[in-house]
Amino acid sequence: MHKIDIDLVNMTLDVMKYAIDRISVTEPKIGIPQKEEDLKALVGETITDKGIGGEVAFNLWKEYLMKANVSIDHPRHLAFVPASPTRAAIMFDLVTSASSIHGAYWMEGAGGIFCENEAMKWIVSLTGLPEGAFGVFTSGGTAANLSAIVTAREYWRSLNDQNKVEKGLIITSIGAHSSIKAMAKVADVDILLVETEEKLTGTALRHTIESLTFHQRKRLFAVVATGGTTNAGIIDDLEGIAQVCEKENIWFHVDAAYGGGALVADSVRHLFNGIEKADSVTIDPHKWMFSPYDCGAVLYKQPKLAMNAHSQQGSYLDIFKDEGAHGFNPTDYQIQLTRRVRGLPLWFSLATHGTDKYKEAVERGIELAQIAGRMIEENPNVELVREPS
């Protein structure tokens, strides 16, 4: 399986041709999902004792299986939260896989981690977080949010012995992403949802905290604000929420997985005022920073607190923490030990195009939303439910 022969060479050429053709297409076929039994009837048994051969397997992919996927980079794919990775990022995703880099520890992945960190410095600079703030790339917003809340929970538990035996409580809005509720289950903390049709404000948060019982208030350790809700792009009152969290000594997390890319746009940057006061921030480069799936990011005002929460110990890991292997170890700041250097495609795209191009692209997206809003208003057959953010 690992030898280099003529079959491997031919397969490599076929795969590279396919990749080049796919990258070169500006309007790929949208694709149509099919039932599992229908796909099975088309391709038959693909996993067998002797194998079906690379050529046959690849042809099945091209002829049947690829066509059962919806191409989310199609220019008219407007549903859900589509991704539109740059060609540079897509190409370097190939390089990332081909390079076979383990991105957990500096000792094994110094070059790749260096590139990730260069991209991360840019993201951190967009938030305005204070000197010393930093972050790591994750598999997505769910892993980033979970990593942040576990960090917050462990910090809260470290404050006194009573917190170690209490079940923590977090507050967020009803419009928060589903991953907040999911990660609360995993982190074994309770969640209180603030009912609001619009954004969560500092005033609403303060009233919610004042309505808590004495015991609930003792268990409250974090507030999760949203920097762009999934359904409507609503950005919470980050400044007001930050002020309440600071006064109440509560961890302030901002889930900007969806909207965080807009931090680069001067026209809407003011909507995120207050994010610079967060204790942690989630941003997904695979959404509005034009990276291929999967690439999330979690940022910390005090990375040391994340290290205290996530650094794994084991005799087999000691060598990675030896002085001779000293460097930044991404695994110490999030829940995953094994990780690919998923920030590499973003780094290459940024290095290729420059940050000004990113700003132009995001501003253009905002402009298109405004144009779409006006077109809907002018059309008597449809109704504009909400003004573009």
Question: What are the functions of these language-model segments?
Answer:
Residues M1, S99-M107, P130-V136, E166-K167, ...:
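Glycine- and acidic
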Residues S84, A88-M91, F137, A143-S147:
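Conserved redox-cofactor binding core of oxidoreductases
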Residues G140-M307:
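Conserved PLP-enzyme active-site core in the AAT-like
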Residues E131-G132, V385-S389:
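Short Gly/Ser/Thr- and Asp/Glu-enriched loop/turn motifs at secondary-structure junctions
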Residues G274-P380, E387:
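Active-site C-terminal subdomain of aminotransferase-like
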Residues M1-G132:
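N-terminal entrance/gating region of PLP-dependent enzymes' catalytic architecture
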